């Protein structure tokens, strides 16, 4: 019985961290990460996409949340379950150039393909063509900036 309570407490913290990353709630995120830094690499068990906090911050365009997660050891190479995409693929897809720059500086591989065969550059270029507008509030300029940064680091389509 005790193990189930421990598991429930862990899942609650993971859910809270993902929610904090989505909102950019740095104080709440810092509190959780200070209590258990392993949370930075905890896959959501309530999101069917199987995301990590860094994916959520990327999707929401929460640059400072992404920076905090990296400070606490978030892995840049983890992939979600739905698309098997790294965080760089997520930020490129959602048109978040500031986080693209951050992940590239942290050593994220610019040519990793997701399960659909798309690279981060391919994701960003899809945004410049307007294909992802229904998923993101990014501007076409944001997608162009993201694509140029990825291309400059050797990203391929």
Regions found by a protein language model. Give the residues of each.
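Hydrophobic packing within well-folded, soluble alpha/beta domains
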Residues: 29-32, 54-57, 66-69, 88-91, ...
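Conserved ankyrin/ankyrin-like repeat signature
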Residues: 28, 64-65, 98-99, 132, ...
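Ankyrin repeat domain, specifically the short helix-to-loop turn at the C-terminus of the second helix
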Residues: 33-39, 67-75, 101-109, 149-156
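N-terminal segments that cap or nucleate solenoid repeat domains
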Residues: 3-49
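Ankyrin repeat A-helix N-terminal signature
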Residues: 19-24, 56-62, 90-96, 123-134
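Ankyrin-repeat boundary/"N-cap" motif
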Residues: 11-17, 43-53, 79-86, 113-126
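A generic tandem-repeat structural signature
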Residues: 75-99, 105
